[in-house]
Amino acid sequence: MAQAAQINVLDISTRLRVEHDKKRRQFSIRLNGSHDKAVLLYEYVGKKTVDLQHTEVPEAYRGREIAKHLAKAAMDFVVEEDLKAHLTCWYIQKFVKENPHPQYLERILH
């Protein structure tokens, strides 16, 4: 039975789709077709500056790199929109440290 759950976990991670709600200023992933969702919240703190504030993944889904998909989507948004970013969220700080792409690094405000 545990093996079946493991297969299901792998299936979830291969079908993740990040949605961006610009009005609510959040990126989200619906998890396993349920009402559960992982979110990354941000705020505009200037005309071309965002603060990537918080990432949250429901406890039952942690450790499956779901937050990594949210962080990548958020940083890609910063690049595509030619924004600058404050990284208040510790997870996004970790993501950028582990993925030090020049297009990310040049947009981070310290």
Swiss-Prot record:
Transmembrane segments: none annotated. Residues 19-109 form the N-acetyltransferase domain. InterPro entries: Acyl_CoA_acyltransferase (IPR016181), Gcn5-rel_NAT (IPR045057), GNAT_YJDJ (IPR031165). PROSITE patterns: GNAT_YJDJ. Belongs to the NATD1 family. This is Protein NATD1. It comes from Danio rerio. The gene is natd1.
